[in-house]
Amino acid sequence: MTQQFYVSPEQLMKDRADFARKGIARGRSVVVISCEEGIALVAENPSPSLHKIGEIYDKIAFAAVGKYNEFESLRQAGVRYADVRGYSYDREDVTARGLASVYAQSLGAVFTAEQKPFEVELAVAEVGGNQSDDHLYRLTFDGSIADEKRFIVMGGQADKVAETVEGGWQQELNFAGAIRLAMKGLVTDKEAGELPASALEVAVLDRASESTRGSRRAFRRLGDDEIAALLSKEN
């Protein structure tokens, strides 16, 4: 007769959490920084096509670490949610807080009910009219949600990267300064003094997109040449 093994709910949840954390720890870090000109999103990502950063809606962006297929499915679901809500109600009704709540419900349901949890950590960012109106939300594998201030760091070396970003963050940072600060954090654990532009994925949420580009869409992805030029600028 086969012996049945009992696993307590506490142990089951702990095992699931440990499993998810190990998967996330293998991922390269992502930094999201609120600055004077908007919000900068910087990821260590040598792939030119498998993006860890993406646009969700007019002033909302998404960043993630972990398993690509899992966070990409969440990004696509977020885009569909935003499009439907904006069409059904009003574009102003699509907010980072609403999207983060939807993600939290999905992650929490998978963590408790499915065979395995998602090995992902997410950031949802919304740029405001001024820096105090920016919204940064961090979501973990179990559906926990945190309203962060100034910056978010995710990934395997998050603590070390966050220490560097914390020490260099200033309210007056422009995009160039924020991107350089993020890169400085990302190379904290590396022998090389800097990462090449081709190893970085960078996007911004431009606070002044309507006045400078005549567009509600604040999200803009930077190419290698523009990243290299920004990294060489004096703040």
Curated annotation (Swiss-Prot):
Keywords: Cytoplasm, Proteasome. SUPFAM superfamilies: N-terminal nucleophile aminohydrolases (Ntn hydrolases) (SSF56235). It is found in: Cytoplasm. One of its GO terms (molecular function) is threonine-type endopeptidase activity. It comes from Arthrobacter sp. (strain FB24). InterPro entries: Ntn_hydrolases_N (IPR029055), Proteasome_alpha-type (IPR023332), Proteasome_asu_bac (IPR022296), Proteasome_sua/b (IPR001353). The lineage of its organism: Bacteria, Bacillati, Actinomycetota, Actinomycetes, Micrococcales. It holds the Pfam family Proteasome. The 20S proteasome core is composed of 14 alpha and 14 beta subunits that assemble into four stacked heptameric rings, resulting in a barrel-shaped structure. The two inner rings, each composed of seven catalytic beta subunits, are sandwiched by two outer rings, each composed of seven alpha subunits. The catalytic chamber with the active sites is on the inside of the barrel. Has a gated structure, the ends of the cylinder being occluded by the N-termini of the alpha-subunits. Is capped by the proteasome-associated ATPase, ARC. Its main location: cytoplasm. Belongs to the peptidase T1A family. GO terms for biological process: modification-dependent protein catabolic process; proteasomal protein catabolic process. The keyword Cytoplasm applies. This is Proteasome subunit alpha. GO terms for cellular component: cytoplasm; proteasome core complex, alpha-subunit complex. The formation of the proteasomal ATPase ARC-20S proteasome complex, likely via the docking of the C-termini of ARC into the intersubunit pockets in the alpha-rings, may trigger opening of the gate for substrate entry. Interconversion between the open-gate and close-gate conformations leads to a dynamic regulation of the 20S proteasome proteolysis activity. Component of the proteasome core, a large protease complex with broad specificity involved in protein degradation. Pathway: Protein degradation; proteasomal Pup-dependent pathway.
